[in-house]
């Protein structure tokens, strides 16, 4: 039986409790988002989804093993509402999708001990569910439960275009890592759209969702520019070739909705799949399962691969856990009755 062996942690006694200025005293329970920076620092987005006020916060940890302990963060800030999604903009900027309907840009300042607001734009009419930065680094895309997708100029701090191409709530947008004008979107209208902002009619429908289940998550293949994957509400993960809009591979990975898909930085990348069944699955290029963890006790919401250790995958969830998984890089033996990590 293969056990998870998390990276060694620094004993609490060896660390100094030092809550930075302006950081909230307490982190909300539901962890929604996690992103490693290129130097191995970890960014977290948290939300409180119960009670009279839906609050949120951002947290920056130079030592990821200390997360989610507030006293050992390097910077933190309270947000007006819950954090639905976030992503890095370079090494300093933080783009946030807010439950308030705002798209927010924050920035690390003061030797990375402060997170300061650069702009906050209320241009969506409902929760902003998803954000992504185009590969140019100067423009971003937001998707909302108001059915709209907006293109943003980050330097000018303004929206450039607004599209109502979907007939349902937008669940995910994903920028192509290969082409700076191309991204994907999916929605509760069951459709997946391929976008190219250079075109007069920028959206084209991908006829790849034959199952009829609602697509919930998208991710581009990091090396093959025409390939992407999507997850659906039924727990299946499918691989699509945009050249012919066909689904070339599909697997029933989870028993409930897929919440996030994240490719690894390996030369032959693994795919991390997260779900509301509280599990993490890691798949190889043929969609064979190489790793499974059920360590979370609530919905698993996000995952991020370490840029410094390619076998290290960090997940967060609504159980307030930040779990560091060591994914085997060598082939696993044939699965037996005890092969699932609990």
From Swiss-Prot:
Function statement: Non-catalytic component of the methylosome complex, composed of PRMT5, WDR77 and CLNS1A, which modifies specific arginines to dimethylarginines in several spliceosomal Sm proteins and histones. This modification targets Sm proteins to the survival of motor neurons (SMN) complex for assembly into small nuclear ribonucleoprotein core particles. Might play a role in transcription regulation. Substrate-recognition component of the DCX(WDR77) complex, which mediates ubiquitination and degradation of Irgm in intestinal cells.
Renumbered ranges of WD repeats: 22-75, 78-116, 123-162, 165-205, 209-250, 253-293, 295-330
Alphabetized PANTHER family for the sequence: METHYLOSOME PROTEIN 50, METHYLOSOME PROTEIN WDR77
GO biological process terms, semicolon-separated: epithelial cell proliferation involved in prostate gland development; negative regulation of cell population proliferation; negative regulation of epithelial cell proliferation involved in prostate gland development; oocyte axis specification; positive regulation of cell population proliferation; protein polyubiquitination; regulation of transcription by RNA polymerase II; secretory columnal luminar epithelial cell differentiation involved in prostate glandular acinus development
Organism for this UniProt entry: Rattus norvegicus (Rat)
Keywords on record: Cytoplasm, Nucleus, Phosphoprotein, Repeat, Ubl conjugation pathway, WD repeat
Gene that this polypeptide is encoded by: Wdr77
Subunit structure: Component of the methylosome complex composed of PRMT5, WDR77 and CLNS1A. Found in a complex composed of PRMT5, WDR77 and RIOK1. RIOK1 and CLNS1A bound directly to PRMT5 at the same binding site, in a mutually exclusive manner, which allows the recruitment of distinct methylation substrates, such as nucleolin/NCL and Sm proteins, respectively. Found in a complex wit the component of the methylosome, PRMT5, CLNS1A, WDR77, PRMT1 and ERH. Directly interacts with PRMT5, as well as with several Sm proteins, including SNRPB and SNRPD2 and, more weakly, SNRPD3 and SNRPE.
Domain of life: Eukaryota
Entry protein name: Methylosome protein WDR77
One GO cellular component, as annotated: Golgi apparatus
Pfam families, sorted: WD40
Primary subcellular site in the record, as a coarse category: nucleus
Localization per Swiss-Prot or TrEMBL: Nucleus; Cytoplasm
GO molecular function, one term: ubiquitin-like ligase-substrate adaptor activity
Keyword Nucleotide-binding among record annotations: no
Modified residues (Phosphoserine): 5
């Amino acid at each position: 039986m293969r056990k998870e062996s998390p990276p060694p942690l620094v004993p609490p006694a060896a660390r100094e409790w030092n809550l930075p200025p302006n950081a909230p005293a307490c982190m909300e329970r539901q962890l929604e988002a996690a992103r490693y920076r290129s130097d191995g620092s970890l960014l977290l987005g948290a939300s409180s989804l119960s009670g009279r006020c839906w609050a949120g916060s951002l947290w920056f940890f130079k030592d990821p093993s200390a997360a989610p302990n507030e006293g050992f963060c390097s910077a933190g800030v309270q947000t007006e509402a819950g954090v639905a999604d976030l992503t890095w903009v370079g090494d300093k900027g933080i783009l946030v999708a807010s439950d308030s309907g705002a798209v927010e840009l924050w920035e690390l300042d003061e030797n990375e001990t402060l997170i300061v607001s650069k702009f906050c734009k209320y241009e969506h009419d409902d929760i902003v569910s998803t954000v992504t930065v185009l590969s140019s680094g100067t423009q971003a895309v937001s998707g909302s439960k108001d059915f709209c997708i907006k293109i943003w100029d980050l330097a000018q701090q303004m929206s450039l275009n607004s599209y109502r191409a979907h007939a349902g709530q937008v669940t995910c947008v994903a920028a192509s890592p290969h082409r700076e004008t191309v991204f994907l979107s999916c929605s509760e209208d069951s459709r997946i759209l391929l976008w190219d902002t250079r075109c007069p009619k920028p959206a084209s429908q991908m006829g790849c969702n034959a199952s009829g289940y609602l697509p919930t998550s998208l991710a581009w293949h990091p090396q093959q520019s025409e390939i992407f994957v999507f997850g659906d509400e039924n727990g299946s993960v499918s691989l699509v070739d945009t050249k012919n809009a066909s689904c070339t591979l599909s697997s029933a990975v989870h028993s409930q909705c897929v919440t996030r898909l994240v490719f690894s930085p390996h030369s032959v990348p693994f795919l991390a799949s997260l779900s509301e069944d509280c599990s993490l699955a890691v798949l190889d290029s043929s969609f064979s399962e190489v790793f499974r963890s059920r360590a979370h006790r609530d919905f698993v919401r996000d995952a991020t691969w370490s840029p410094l250790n390619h076998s290290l995958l960090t997940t967060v969830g609504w159980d307030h856990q930040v779990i560091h998984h060591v994914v085997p890089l060598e082939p696993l033996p044939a699965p037996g009755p005890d092969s699932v990590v609990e």
